[in-house]
Every structure is written in C-alpha cells, then in structure tokens.
Amino acid sequence: MSTDFDRIYLNQSKFSGRFRIADSGLGWKISTSGGSAANQARKPFLLPATELSTVQWSRGCRGYDLKINTKNQGVIQLDGFSQDDYNLIKNDFHRRFNIQVEQREHSLRGWNWGKTDLARNEMVFALNGKPTFEIPYARINNTNLTSKNEVGIEFNIQDEEYQPAGDELVEMRFYIPGVIQTNVDENMTKKEESSNEVVPKKEDGAEGEDVQMAVEEKSMAEAFYEELKEKADIGEVAGDAIVSFQDVFFTTPRGRYDIDIYKNSIRLRGKTYEYKLQHRQIQRIVSLPKADDIHHLLVLAIEPPLRQGQTTYPFLVLQFQKDEETEVQLNLEDEDYEENYKDKLKKQYDAKTHIVLSHVLKGLTDRRVIVPGEYKSKYDQCAVSCSFKANEGYLYPLDNAFFFLTKPTLYIPFSDVSMVNISRAGQTSTSSRTFDLEVVLRSNRGSTTFANISKEEQQLLEQFLKSKNLRVKNEDREVQERLQTALGSDSDEEDINMGSAGEDDESVDEDFQVSSDNDADEVAEEFDSDAALSDAEGGSDEERPSKKPKVE
C-alpha cells in the first residue's frame, strides 16, 4: 500500500501535486484542479527505487523540504510537507528502501562568505559546517572566469519542465581570492589519460636521472572554475559535437570563437568567455552580404538573449570571408543520420563556410534562412549606408522587414510599421545631399530614424517601400506642393488687384501740381547753403550802416 501527500511542489514549480511513496519507487503528479492547459500538459514524474541514493529533510520555502539525491538524475526537491510528516516519511523510506532520512539544518546568519563543496549532484555553499544554500548542477547553464579572482555562474531558465513561481535568479558571482601552487615537471608524463600516476620520461634510454620541478601558480578562482565545469559537466564533450567550426570571427559579441554544434545546443568557446545556447533560443537566421563586397554576415536572433554580466546579446553577428570555403563531415552514425537527419542535413559538405553553417543551423533548428530580397540600391547593392543615432551602419530593406547592421543590430518587421516618413537631414549645402528615413511603429511604440541616407537612393527606396504596401510620407514633397500652391494663389491675386500698375508706360497724374516760385525759394533756402547769404547780399548798400573810421 502506498503513502500519499497532497499539495506538494516538485522542484520549486508553480503548481502543486500529489506525492506518492510506493515499493517500486516515488511518484508525483500535478493536481488537475483548475483544468488549465499547463496542468494537463505536465507529465507525471516517476523515480524508480533503484535510483535513490540519499534523502535529506530540512526547512523549505513552503514548509518542510525533502531532497533526494539520485544516482543518475541529479537532485529532486519536494517542498510543502508539514513537520508532522517527518516520522511517517522516515519510517516509510527505511521500511521500503532501507534508506535513512537525514535531518539537515541550514545556516540562517545571512553572511555572504563561506566555503563551497562540489558534491555529487549539487554545489553546496556552507558556513560553519551548515549549508547556506545549494545549487543543483542541472540548474547551471554556463560558468565563466570573469576576472582573476571572480567566477560567474549563469542559471538555466530555458528548461521547459522547470516552471518556478515569481522572479528567477539568472546569475551569481563568487569572489575567490588567493593562489595555489602546483609542481609541474616538464620531463614527467602521465602513464594513462585516466590515471593520475606520473612516471619520468625516458630520454636516450636513461632512467632515474634527476628531473627539474617547476612551480606553477594558479588562482583559486581558476581552480574552482575548472572543477565546477568538470563536476557540472557543462556542455557536451567536444567529441560529441555533430560539427565544429574553428576560429570564427564574431562582431557581436566581439572576438573569435570555436563553434561546437550539438543535437540540442550550441557552445561558443572563446579565449575568455564561453557561451551556451539551446537550439530553441534561435528565432531567426539571417544571411546577408556585407556592403564592402569582401565579407558575408550571418546573424542569429536569440530569445532570450545571451548574457554576460549586465550586457545582453539578442543578436549574434558572425563575419566570414566571402569566398572562404570549408569541407566537413557530420559526426553522426549512419543509422542515426538516416533515421533523424537525412531530410535536414547532408552527410558531407564542401562549400562556402557561411553556406555550410547556415544550412546546418537551418536543419537543426527548423528555422528558415532569411536572405536579401528584391531591393537593389543605385549601386546594385542590397543595403544603403546610413546612421542610427551616433552609429554608422547599413540598412537592409528585406522583403518583410528592415534590418540594420552592425551596432546596434535592429530588426523591424513590416507588420509592426505604421508609416514611413522621408525628410531632409538639414538645410545646408552638405546635408541637403542626404535624407532621413523615420520608421513609425504601430500602437504608439515610438519611431526609429535612420539618417544620412544618400539622396540618390531616395527614389528607389521609396518605390520599394510602396511596393510592400507601406504608407510612405514625403515631407519635403508635401512642403513644396503647399508652397507652390500658396505662391500660385498669390500671383493670381496680384494680377487681379494691380491691374496695369506693372506697365512701364508713363501717364499723367492729375493730382500732381507744379510748385510755385515761393515754394521753390523755400526749398532753395533749405538745401542751398548760399541761399541765405545771397539774400543778405542782395540788399542795398545804403541800408547798411557805414563803419566809423578809427580815431587815433
């Protein structure tokens, strides 16, 4: 007879269910109350008795927590028990599986330092011998050595079976100071790859010679990083990759990375950082020739984006030499290829690198590859040079979207566009040779302006946008039309009101009268400096008093 518990949460899920302990193992099934699609789609969880390893009892988020360490399925967490359930669970596990349930007390001091223990299925952060928190390896998506003494851990939020309630932690960083010293002997070699035993190399048939030991320093952070990668088994082994591409140049995130493509994921291995993304994260694959006619770009739209600290990368931009070719053979068994990949992939490729990579990604992700469409610029290219804010780049008018490269990468589907405004960039002689293209989005979501596009491209670009049934508004043309209309109406009114005023023929003005002599004299007095003097001199000498002679 089995033992059942209701309202139990599996692995911090949103929904509760029924937990059952039976002789054959453990089971959990989500409650069907509510009838939601999410509830009905969740499959029951079953764990055979042979998978049980250790069981721990401790305080949890919703009461008491039962943590089960399995042999091959990681850590299973069941939360929502009451304190009274402990004795029943303890007796059941001992009677059915001969396993002791260990009571575990957590440290509640709230300190942010302690010691880490990389256990079988999880990383334990402990303080004074008591665990503060645990991180199951299955929840770790990636880890990077972010600096000399710092290790960053990114958590997996893409697991469809993992549906946590509320906010979700996406990254955690550990500061690990100090260094460790290891003795390295250049004349020593491992006896076997799987063994830690070392033996001296034989040089010229001599044995037992003195060997020189070199001391190598390694930071504690680097040692922790390497051990965590090994324990957590982050990413598949390189030998399991279906196909690999070496030293591929990325403009976003900038650097060179080795690309290992697996059945369900892709790993990018750089000198400093490594990234991992699932195939289902790839939303679009865009293959575009670069305007320099030397390189070719392959863009992957990622949702949710890759993260590196506070920086997110919603687009991965790969750059190849246009004529670079590669020859690869897929690492697949013939039976596996015939059964699962025959209609999607080729067994062997010998073509240009960007074509090979895009075809492989298309086959594994079931996403079509977007290529340039009908638009051609005046210089027979599929893009026009422009700028977005302070960044220069190229605008690709595709058949169903605007695409701007390279920084920042912008993708604007035509279905989101309300209208397109074409306006001049300025009024000076230099800026009048360019125009702005403002893309107004629907539902009042703002607009995006691409500036400094050559005037030579305006007519072709405008015709292309109209052919895609986009509403195009040319502000300059409307202003000119309004101005011409206004000027035309003014000239008509002047012709009507002025009559013959514009003629050059002279006519007599009847209101004009010739001034009299007195008026002329007054004018002369005003403007002729000699006028007053002449009047004074015009008088007789008799009226002028004679000057008395000087008497000596």
From Swiss-Prot:
The lineage of its organism: Eukaryota, Fungi, Dikarya, Ascomycota, Saccharomycotina. Component of the FACT complex, a general chromatin factor that acts to reorganize nucleosomes. The FACT complex is involved in multiple processes that require DNA as a template such as mRNA elongation, DNA replication and DNA repair. During transcription elongation the FACT complex acts as a histone chaperone that both destabilizes and restores nucleosomal structure. Forms a stable heterodimer with SPT16. The SPT16-POB3 dimer weakly associates with multiple molecules of NHP6 (NHP6A or NHP6B) to form the FACT (yFACT or SNP) complex. The FACT complex interacts with the CK2 (casein kinase II) complex subunits CKA1, CKA2, CKB1 and CKB2 and the components of the transcription machinery CHD1, CTR9, PAF1 and CDC73. The FACT complex interacts with the PAF1 complex. SPT16 interacts with SAS3 and POL1. Interacts directly with RFA1. Coiled coil: none annotated. GO terms for biological process: chromatin organization; DNA repair; DNA-templated DNA replication; nucleosome organization; positive regulation of RNA polymerase II transcription preinitiation complex assembly; regulation of chromatin organization. Changing residue 308 to K: Confers sensitivity to HU indicating a disturbed activity in DNA replication; confers a SPT- phenotype indicating a disturbed activity in transcription. This is FACT complex subunit POB3. It comes from Saccharomyces cerevisiae (strain ATCC 204508 / S288c). Changing residue 311 to A: No change of sensitivity to HU; confers a SPT- phenotype indicating a disturbed activity in transcription. Keywords: Chromosome, DNA damage, DNA repair, DNA replication, Nucleus, Transcription, Transcription regulation. Residues 490-529 have a biased composition (Acidic residues). GO terms for molecular function: DNA binding. PANTHER family: FACT COMPLEX SUBUNIT SSRP1. It comes from the Eukaryota. The gene is POB3.
